[in-house]
C-alpha cells in the first residue's frame, strides 16, 4: 500500500480561500459553446444509480486527460497561489446558509471532476471560468477550455458562529472527503471505497469520484445533499451523502456498487489517518532520533469497535517498523471508528497544528453489512506528513461482476468519543521491561510488561479497594506470566499491568479488561506486539 503524502498540502488548502462575501448564482452566467449543459428535470439518487450502471458497461477512463501546460507542472508553491474568489461562492442565493467553493486543477490533483449545483433536484453544472479564481503571479494563456473542470469542492456553513462561514466538508482527490464538527480542525480523512488495501503486493486501487451534484434544498434547510458518481477499473458506484452540520456533524451515506471485475478485498466506509508518535510505542520511535520536541504526533490514537454483542474493543494505534495488518471478526458489527481520544494540549505541544482538536470519525451501519472483518492496516512512517493508518470493514464475500452491492451507514465527527458507552475506557498504553528497576530478576528479551490505564465508568468506586477487581486477559502467540491491577488516582481509575512472554518470530495478540464478579466494568483493550520491535 502506498502512503499518501498530503499533510502539508491539506493544511495549506485551508488557507486558499477564507471568508465568504455576498454569493452570486453561477446559473446566470452565459455558458457558451462546449460548456456542460444543465439537467432541467428533477434529479436524484436513482439517476446516479442509472449512470453508474451504464458506466459499468464501458471501460474505465483510468488515465486523466492532459491539463493545459500552465497547470500541468505546478509545484505546491505555485499551486497554492490559485485562490478561489470568495465573492463567487455558490448556493447562497435564496438565503441558504450553505455556500460552495471549487478547487482548481493542478499539482497532485489532475483528474477533473464535474460539479453540479442546484435545489430540490434541479441542477446545473458549474462552467470553468478564470473569473472564479485569483491566479497570483501565474501567467495564463488567453483562452482556456470552459469544460476544464475542477479538482473538487468544499462547502461552508456557520458551524462555530452564527455569523461565520466555516468549512464544513471537502471532497478533493480520488474518493477522499473530510468534514468537521464544532471547534474541530481537519485531521483524518474518509474515502468512498477502498480496494485491495493492505496487500503486500502493493496492488491497491484508488477509486475516484468523477461527478457531483450538490443540493442545498430550500433556504431553511439545515442539511445539504451530495450525490456522487464513482469510477475505477474494477467498480462503479452511486453515492448519496446527507450532511447535517452541528456540534458533532453527521453524514448519512447510501451506496450502490456495480463491479466490472472481481475484487479480492473490498473496504467499506474506509478511514485514513496518521499516527507517528505516541506514548505506547516510544520504544520504537525514540523522539531523540527524530530531534522532535513534541511528545506525540497523531491525527488518531486508536481504533474503537462495537460488536454485535455490544462488546466495545479499543485498539491503540502504533507506528510499526514494518507493515502490520490486524483483523477483527465483525459479523453484525454495530460500529467502528478511528478516534483521537487524547484531547490535551500538553500531549502534543503544537500551538499551530492543534492535534488535540482533530476529530474522531465514528461509523454506524444502517443496513445489514453481513459477515466480515474490521481490518486495521498500519504502515511505517518516518514523519507526520504521511497517512499510514487505514481502517475499513471488509466483507467476507469478494466482489464479483454481475453482483450489485448495496449498503448504508452513518458517520459522525466526534471529540474523544468516550461517551459512546458508559464503561471504563482506556486512557493510555505503555510498555517496559517485565521487571522492577534494580531488580535482581533476570531479563528475558521475549518478555515485556504492558501497562494499561483505565478510567471512567464506575472505576473510581473501587479506588479504595482494588482487590474487588479481576483482570480478564487473552493471548495468542504469547503467554501471560503475571497480571495485577493498582489504583491510579491521577486519572481516578486503575492501571493494569501484564507481563507477557512472546513467541519468537510471531506477532502476539493480547486482550485485557476489568470486571467485578460477573459485571464487566471496562471496554476490552486489544493490542498486537512483536518482540523484535523492542
Predicted regions and their residues:
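Acidic, contiguous internal or C-terminal segments within carbohydrate-active enzymes
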Residues: 228-277
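Extended, loop-rich substrate-binding clefts of extracytoplasmic carbohydrate-active enzymes
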Residues: 189-246, 367-386
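Signal peptide processing junction and immediate N-terminal pro/mature segment
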Residues: 24-32
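Hydrophobic residues positioned within well-ordered beta-strands of beta-sheet architectures
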Residues: 113, 224-226, 237-241, 251-253, ...
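N-terminal secretory signal peptides and thylakoid transit peptides that target proteins
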Residues: 1-17
